[in-house]
Amino acid sequence: MARRSDHSHEEIRDMVLAAAEHIIVEQGHDGLTARKVASEIGYTVGTLYLVFENLDDLIMHINARTLNRLHQLMTDGETQNLAPEDRLMQLGQIYIHFAYSDPHCWALIFEHRPTDDRPMPDWYAEKVMRVFVIVEETLQPLAPHRTESEISQAACALWAGIHGICILGITQKLGDVGEDSVQNLAKSLIVNYLSGFANYQNQPMMNKHI
């Protein structure tokens, strides 16, 4: 068993996060326990709680790292040079491929429920929102007549649709389909949604039948 002095506070923190992510990838998030993490890094369970408040806090930081990786992929230089329609298609493809490549860490963002009722910290909420901001910024040039709130609503609607297709595909609720089929469904959703979103100009979105 390693001594606490063998590693700095930050080193232990990074070791815990890496070990926890490895367990999630191998066993799913249901397999994650403080005891397993401690065993993997060679420290006591008590050491984990010197760097994280509790298991919920650890999971939130794991989710933050997952969101960071997703954000980095979505802001890759290649996507920023595309036309808005093409960029939205690419963003959808990136999201679905990310989910299929790392399904357990991806699912943990949405499936974990903290044991207390404390609100989401601002630093974590910012990581969630900046993913939506990318979609909002890409949508805006396609419909300059839309208000800021309509753009935000559209970004949420598109994400919800793509996310739903992704969940149904990964959990095999669409039958025995693979990532390619899910990608095609997402493309169809984006094409049809954008057609209505860009062309209906004279009425508020809530009154549209797109």
Would you name each region that the model predicts?
Residues 12-20, 37, 62-66, 70, ...:
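Generic hydrophobic, amphipathic alpha-helix propensity
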Residues 118-144, 152-156, 184-195:
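Amphipathic alpha-helical packing segments from all-alpha helical-bundle domains
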Residues 64-88, 120, 129-131, 137-141:
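Amphipathic alpha-helical linker/stalk segments
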Residues 75-104, 129, 145-148, 154-158:
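Hydrophobic alpha-helical connector segments
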Residues 158-177, 192-203:
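Amphipathic C-terminal alpha-helical segment
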Residues 101-119, 167-175:
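Amphipathic alpha-helical segments used for helix-helix packing
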Residues 15, 23-57, 61:
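Helix-turn-helix
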Residues 1-11, 81, 201-210:
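N-terminal intrinsically disordered/low-complexity leader segments
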